[in-house]
């Protein structure tokens, strides 16, 4: 894990190394200052030697300035390294998510991915920034201050060997308790993000069903759970401070009592025992030693807090995409013919029954294919295997006579355009959204595609036309308008295969008929697969596939199915009766 995260330093590697080096310089100066202070008192103030006073005062000033410079440099480099590390980590995770297949994404909820890319990375950044400074400062301060105090008085320094184990024992007792709590906190954050995202995306539904109070209550419950867990963690961590203070005060009192007796006994003579200046230095070293332990405990706490985010981010980085392009991949799709050969598919190995079973189909290039079936009959699953959004569990899917697994993924998906059930538009102008289909499309091509999708009429009715701004998720256009924009975007790809997954359900029958007519006249060479609930949307198709319980129930054109399929005929008659009513 450490090796993988270290790769995120990249161009900030040297910056991350310079910060601890500067910190060593700062600590060295801080440890030197008490020694200079002792000499200032013992050899200057105590004996009235102003030359020594001025010399030591100048040394103190130099030490303070150098310490300040090193401290500022260390903080600056640490900030740059931590910010750069977080940026690279976030980029690596985001790029990895872009390579995920649908089955990879199914392992993580969208809310969990958002949390990992935002708050988890922010927590890791703070921990990293503290570590590259304090993880060096604390041990260095502890060691140098201990050595300096041992040189002054080994007898007084023994008090540290009592205080340090006590603090270490408290810390070791706190760590496992707090780790469990913080691990639970970050999982709860995922639930909180899920609630927020669902509420924001479905705000119209929430308001139409007057569920505001219910949503507020749900949010309050989860938020309260996070609050309770944080309070538990803080209560446990709070034990660290009083234990630390007790140890500090106990050490200072012990050194004051024993040290004062040593100063009096020696007559303030260093050769015979201890001087007043050395005793004052011992007080400073006591504070430095125990405060370094306190800071070290804070580092441990921060490391504990970052363990859960580190593990969660590592899961993203280590998740291998299930779908990759093979070596020597096919770089060209010959035509739009499609073959399903003994295809079975399960969304997971644990699934009790397959979503698709024993599917055998041949669709010639340029054909118009209608797909019909009840809810849950795996119509969408069937077409998602064509651009290899999932891999089949058994059998094979072929496009242009070649197994989809043999294609370069980009090449295959560039030649297959899908308009999904859930239409997605992005914030930006209509032009920017359309150019997702073809970044280099001219304005004339945009207009032509929109005319085929019957979208040009309503676009030109907007004051800004094709420059009209689309809100996030397309919230400022109707469902039918959104569908037509998505169809136009797909047409701009000029694909060999066009898949419409119930993509005209929100448009009226007249517009639906106009779109189908435009497809027939303008893109006759493109294989068109149309999933629909209305038979009127697909009855003029060359082939109609009826799905039932993940299997192909029957195949044929409209006339054939009306004669041979009771299921198809029943749907047709019920829809005809409904339209008459």
Region spans (language model):
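Transmembrane helices of ABC transporter permease
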Residues: 11, 15-28, 39, 63, ...
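Short intracellular "coupling" helices and adjacent cytoplasmic loop segments at the cytosolic face
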Residues: 47-48, 83, 91-115, 119-121, ...
């Amino acid at each position: 894990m450490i090796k993988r995260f270290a790769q995120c330093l990249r161009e900030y590697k040297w910056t991350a190394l310079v910060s601890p080096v500067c910190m060593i310089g700062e600590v060295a100066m801080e440890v030197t200052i008490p020694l200079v202070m002792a000499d200032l008192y013992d050899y200057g103030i105590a004996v009235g030697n102003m030359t020594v006073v001025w010399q030591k005062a100048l040394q103190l000033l130099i030490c303070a300035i150098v310490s300040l410079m090193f401290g500022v440099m260390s903080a600056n480099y640490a900030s740059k390294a931590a910010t750069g590390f977080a940026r690279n980590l976030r980029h690596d995770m985001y790029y990895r998510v872009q390579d995920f297949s649908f089955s990879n994404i199914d392992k993580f909820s969208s809310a969990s991915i958002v949390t990992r890319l935002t708050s988890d990375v922010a927590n890791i950044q703070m921990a990293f920034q503290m570590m590259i400074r304090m993880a060096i400062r604390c041990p260095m301060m502890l060691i140098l201050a201990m050595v300096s105090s041992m040189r002054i008085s080994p007898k007084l320094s023994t008090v540290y060997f009592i205080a340090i184990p006590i603090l270490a024992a408290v810390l070791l007792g706190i760590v496992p308790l707090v780790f469990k709590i913080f691990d639970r906190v970050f999982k709860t954050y995922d639930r909180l993000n899920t609630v927020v995202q669902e509420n924001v995306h479905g705000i119209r539904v929430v308001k139409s069903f007057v569920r505001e109070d219910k949503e507020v209550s749900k949010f309050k419950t989860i938020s309260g759970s996070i609050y309770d867990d944080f309070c538990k963690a803080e209560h446990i961590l709070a034990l660290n401070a009083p234990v630390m203070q007790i140890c500090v005060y106990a050490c200072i009192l012990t050194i004051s009592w024993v040290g004062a007796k040593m100063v009096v006994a020696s007559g303030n003579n260093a050769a015979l025992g201890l001087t007043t200046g050395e005793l004052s230095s011992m007080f400073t070293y006591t504070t430095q030693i125990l405060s370094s332990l306190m800071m070290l405990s804070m580092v441990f706490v921060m490391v504990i807090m970052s363990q859960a985010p580190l593990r969660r981010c590592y899961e993203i980085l280590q998740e291998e995409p299930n779908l990759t392009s093979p070596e020597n991949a096919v770089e060209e799709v010959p035509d739009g013919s499609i073959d399903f050969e003994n295809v079975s598919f399960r969304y997971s190995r644990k699934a009790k029954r397959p979503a698709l079973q024993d599917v055998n189909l041949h669709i010639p290039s340029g054909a118009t294919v209608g797909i019909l079936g009840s809810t849950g009959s795996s119509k969408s699953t069937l077409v998602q295997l064509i651009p290899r959004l999932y891999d089949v569990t058994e059998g094979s899917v072929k496009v242009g006579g070649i197994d989809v697994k043999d294609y370069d993924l980009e090449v295959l998906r560039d030649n297959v355009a899908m308009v999904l059930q859930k239409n997605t538009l992005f914030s930006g102008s209509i032009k920017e959204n359309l150019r997702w289909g073809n970044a280099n499309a001219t304005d004339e091509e945009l207009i032509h595609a929109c005319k085929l999708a019957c979208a040009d009429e309503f676009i030109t009715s907007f004051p800004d036309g094709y420059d009209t701004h689309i809100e996030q998720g397309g919230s400022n256009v109707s469902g039918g308008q959104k569908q037509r924009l998505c169809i136009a975007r797909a047409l701009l790809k000029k694909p060999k295969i066009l898949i419409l997954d119930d993509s005209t359900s929100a448009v009226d029958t007249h517009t639906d008929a106009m779109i189908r007519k435009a497809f027939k006249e303008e893109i006759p060479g493109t294989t068109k697969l149309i999933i629909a609930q209305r038979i009127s949307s697909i009855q003029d198709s060359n082939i109609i596939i009826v799905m039932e319980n993940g299997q192909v129930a029957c195949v044929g054109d409209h006339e054939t199915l009306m004669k041979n399929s009771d299921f198809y005929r029943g749907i047709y008659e019920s829809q005809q009766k409904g339209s008459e009513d």
